[in-house]
UniProtKB/Swiss-Prot annotation:
It comes from Nitrosopumilus maritimus (strain SCM1). GO terms for cellular component: cytosol. This is ATP-dependent dethiobiotin synthetase BioD. Pfam families: AAA_26 (PF13500). Its cofactor is Mg(2+). The keyword ATP-binding applies. Its EC number is 6.3.3.3. The active site is at K37. It is an enzyme of class 6 (ligase). Keywords: ATP-binding, Biotin biosynthesis, Cytoplasm, Ligase, Magnesium, Metal-binding, Nucleotide-binding. Homodimer. Pathway: Cofactor biosynthesis; biotin biosynthesis; biotin from 7,8-diaminononanoate: step 1/2. It is found in: Cytoplasm. The gene is bioD.
Length: 228
């Protein structure tokens, strides 16, 4: 079973919550799912995982894998790997990321890899998230918003994936609300303009318990298409 890279059209589109929800729902389908966030950044937590996002993923997937495999590199400032490298003099370790991914892949049937920022977030000079996905040799799922402007961002993200020959499993629309693009119209337009299937849309989630995530994702996401 192929692992999947959960990519976003931008930062803060909800990649962590989508990855967590997918992990919970797939586990309920008896898929042995592992999780990974190659790069994380921000203020380190005092207890548990350094990254809150990584902790959310590990709890959702109910894994006890070492932190250095789930999150091989953490930067203590909110910045891209490239900017963190320039500011902190800590170079992103792509070889370590790829090695950790291979090790995790031997421990689980499938790995959900959460990206960082958008698809062209820089890791090194002339090396972006797209390059990393390409080296991992896995397909992607694109997480996008429902707000006005999302069509532009989603099309650009998909075109970059296509340029790098990254297979796309589908699009997930996250956190839809009444003030955004009407979901039915957005789904129609995205599929018509990109030729990529919209796997579903997720409303704002207040209850992040595994039971709640499973219920919401089972109801709203085409999980069978995701696993094809």
């Amino acid at each position: 079973m192929k692992s999947i890279f959960v990519a976003g059209t931008d930062t803060d589109v909800g990649k962590t919550y989508i990855t967590a929800g997918l992990a919970v729902a797939l586990r309920k389908m008896n898929v042995d799912v592992g999780v990974m966030k190659p790069f994380a950044a921000g203020t380190a937590q005092k207890k548990g995982f350094k990254s809150e996002d990584v902790e959310i993923l590990a709890k959702a997937a109910q894994v006890a894998d070492p932190e250095n495999l789930i999150n091989p590199q953490f930067f203590p400032i909110p910045a891209s790997p490239y900017t963190a490298w320039k500011n902190l003099k800590t170079k992103p370790k792509v070889s370590t990321i790829l090695s950790s991914f291979k090790k995790l892949s031997k421990l689980h049937e499938m790995i959900l890899v959460e990206g960082m920022g958008g698809i062209m977030t820089p890791i090194l000079k002339d090396y972006y998230i797209t390059n990393l996905i390409k080296e991992m040799k896995i397909p992607s799922v694109i997480v996008t918003r429902s707000k006005v402007g999302t069509v532009n961002h989603t099309i650009m993200t998909i075109q970059m994936c296509q340029k790098y020959k990254i297979p796309i499993k589908g699009i997930i629309i996250n956190d839809f609300d009444d003030d955004g693009y009407p979901i039915k119209n957005l789904k129609r337009d995205l599929e018509s303009l990109t030729g990529v299937k919209v796997l579903g849309s997720i409303p704002f989630i207040k209850d992040m318990s595994n039971a709640s995530l499973n219920r919401i994702f089972k109801k709203n996401i085409d999980l069978k298409s995701l696993l094809k």
